[in-house]
Amino acid sequence: MSTDPSATYDVYVIEYARSRNQPVASLLLGVYDRGTVDLPFSFVLARNAERTVLIDTGFMRDGSGAALAEKFGIAAWVSPLERLAALGVRPEDVTDIVLTHAHYDHMGSIDRFPNARLFIQKRELLQWIEAMALPARFGFLTAALDAEDVHEALRAAEEHRLTLLEGDRRDLLPGIHVVLGADSHTFGSQYVVVDTAVRGPVVVAGDCAYSYANLTGLDGQGTYIPLGFGVGSHYQSLMVIDKMMREVDDDLSRIIVLHDFERWERFAIEREDDGFRIARV
């Protein structure tokens, strides 16, 4: 971890939406006897004096985003831009966006940040284009993909604001690192490691884990559990989970899981607006 202040960040977990009654089996493979849970949707802000970085962006509830929100049972939503404004961040202030993967709830508002450079794994973007070109009978693969988000990524490429990554990158930005989790949740999912002054390196899991139970096993019994939904293999899912755990020496207080309410027990609540929370890591 760097000791340079420009290479460490203040990190915030920003909740912007919730779905109701999600089957636990869709989060934890094979766990059919635990009923349903409500699910938070979140993204991360990492900032210092030099940079304002988003790790994922959430989605806008209009057009195709509204249709996907209805499809996936999003019962409550507030604009990610409004959530950022609560922390004093304007869209034009965002310098960089690191995308963990291309699902609608993670890159659904990239067009709202006109000055930001975008970073995504090359295989993630290109293989989604391949998947979109398959016959409609393969629609399971693209169920959580918004084609308009892919179009917006290509528009960013036209403006020379898109960087396609090929594998792991240390110091993608000073103090921000990415690790490829290929063929796990998605074709080119990645998790992000952010250096902080207080906690040291912190992992933003993206959807390499849906729940802390993916990391700890049911009731903390210690056996990794693959995700209940993905386009890759269970084996790869477990390998990525293990990488994340080793990254933080099994310290769960240094892993941010974006779809688990349990994280509010690990991080200090900075503010709460109409039930939506922002935590400082």
What are these regions (language model features)?
Residues 13, 43-47, 164-197:
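Core dinuclear metal-dependent hydrolase active-site scaffold
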Residues 2-4, 75-89, 93, 123-180, ...:
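Metallo-beta-lactamase
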Residues 29-32, 67-72, 134-136, 223-227:
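Short glycine-enriched, charge-decorated loop/helix-capping segments at active-site entrances
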Residues 17, 57-59, 102, 123-124, ...:
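Active-site metal-binding loops of divalent metal-dependent hydrolases
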Residues 1-55, 59-63, 67-70, 168, ...:
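Zn-dependent metallo-beta-lactamase
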